């Protein structure tokens, strides 16, 4: 189209008139424009094909978000909190979590429904949490957190403590 290095706002219509347009509030791909319900795209300087998405969603229709969260209150955090797992080749330098305040770190990531994932939280990029066999972990030689992605967005609430399956000072989740 000749438009590069700028942000464009758009939305999909179900039919051929306004009133059948989607509302996208997810800040990953939407929540923009005059009514805060448009999609946005930062246009690169190369041809780009957008991934298919579900109407009014930022992800595919067969995907759900997993909302990772961990409580690291009391730990000295100088280089952030990360998530490393089966979905990113166990690379602690790919998925950085956001500081939500009061020692809580969060991140959302989309996965295909039915996928079983394993992960650990990594403090400062080098301190991997150590977990024992418990309700939120795998067994065997490597003990990792695990879950199977359902058709609903998944949140860990209450937020587990770093290195534990439990809320800080609480009972099993």
Write out the residue ranges for each language-model feature.
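Primarily marks secretory-pathway-exposed extracellular/lumenal segments that are disulfide-
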Residues: 33-75, 143-173
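Aromatic-rich carbohydrate-binding modules that target alpha-glucans
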Residues: 1-7, 15-41, 72-114, 123-148, ...
């Amino acid at each position: 189209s000749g438009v590069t290095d700028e942000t464009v706002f758009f939305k999909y219509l179900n039919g051929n008139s306004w009133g059948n347009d989607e509302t996208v509030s997810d800040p990953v791909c939407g929540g923009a424009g005059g009514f805060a319900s448009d999609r946005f795209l930062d246009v690169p300087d190369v041809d780009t094909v957008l991934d298919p998405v579900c109407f009014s969603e930022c992800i595919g229709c067969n995907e759900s978000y997993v909302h990772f969260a961990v409580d690291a209150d009391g730990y000295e955090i100088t280089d952030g909190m990360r998530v490393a797992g089966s979905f990113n080749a166990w690379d602690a330098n790919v998925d950085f979590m956001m500081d939500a305040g009061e020692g809580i770190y969060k991140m959302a990531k989309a996965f295909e429904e039915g996928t079983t994932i394993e992960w650990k939280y990594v403090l400062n990029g080098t301190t991997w949490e150590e977990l024992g066999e418990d309700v939120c972990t795998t067994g065997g030689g490597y003990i990792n957190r695990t879950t199977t992605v359902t058709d609903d967005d998944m949140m860990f609430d209450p937020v587990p403590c770093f290195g534990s399956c439990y809320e800080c000072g609480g009972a099993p989740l």
